[in-house]
């Protein structure tokens, strides 16, 4: 199981709420028809697509399209509309994935670790994992010195962190919509 927590690479004036991921036993998949799937696919490609253009492309009335999108939001299928900020454009061209393992004695501090680490400006996403690693952090930094400082000051200096492993990202390609 992977739980994703968004970091603070986005506009600091907007508070992003953390969602607690439910297990597959807790959630029944929403009933989606082909129109819903086309709407989701189009919004995945461009979340700013105007409702009239979305309705026209899908072949339904704008009022029907608006109602469909609202229903998908209400059902939790659409969890939000986000700005995808290019780290390079804001001076953070080096990206990495950092695997983090906590000390076994720190298991009760998982939530506080998440809240503390996701506030760091370099952290784009936090993945809470089941498996060999406890977390994977997706981070962006100015350069290797900035990345090293982040790891040393925020992870290695934390007594609750047992170890880390850093992998540099050469290229990030967005996947297809999961529909």
Curated annotation (Swiss-Prot):
Effect of residue 131 to T: Forms a DNA complex that cannot be inhibited by adding amino acids or other inhibitors
Keywords: Activator, DNA-binding, Repressor, Transcription, Transcription regulation
SUPFAM superfamilies according to UniProt: Dimeric alpha+beta barrel, Winged helix' DNA-binding domain
Acyltransferase found in the keyword field: no
Coiled coil, from the record: none
Family matches, as Gene3D superfamilies: 3.30.70.920, Winged helix-like DNA-binding domain superfamily/Winged helix DNA-binding domain (1.10.10.10)
DNA-binding span(s): 51-70
One Pfam family in the UniProt entry: AsnC_trans_reg
Ranges of residues in domain HTH asnC-type: 32-93
Record bears the keyword DNA-binding: yes
GO-annotated biological processes: response to amino acid
Cellular-component GO terms for this entry: cytosol
CDD domains: HTH_ARSR
Gene Ontology terms for molecular function: sequence-specific DNA binding
Inhibition and activation profile: The DNA-binding activity of AldR is modulated by interaction of AldR with various amino acids. Alanine, tryptophan, tyrosine and aspartate completely abolish the DNA binding ability of AldR. On the other hand, glutamate and asparagine reduce AldR binding to DNA but do not completely abolish it. Binding of amino acids can lead to structural modifications and changes in oligomeric association. Activity is also inhibited by 3 small molecule inhibitors, tetrahydroquinoline carbonitrile derivative (S010-0261), levothyroxine and liothyronine, which can disrupt the AldR-DNA complex.
Residue stretches spanning the membrane: none
Subunit and interaction comment: Homooctamer. Homotetramer. Tetramer of dimers. The N-terminal DNA-binding domains are swapped, forming a dimer, and four dimers are assembled into an octamer through crystal symmetry.
Domain commentary: Contains an N-terminal DNA-binding domain, followed by a rather long linker and a C-terminal effector-binding domain, which is also involved in oligomeric interactions.
The protein's role, per its UniProt record: Transcriptional regulator that might play a role under hypoxic conditions. Regulates the expression of ald, which encodes L-alanine dehydrogenase. Serves as both an activator for ald expression in the presence of L-alanine and a repressor in the absence of L-alanine. Acts by binding directly to the upstream region of the ald gene. Four AldR-binding sites (O2, O1, O4 and O3) were identified upstream of the ald gene.
Protein name: HTH-type transcriptional regulator AldR
The encoding gene: aldR
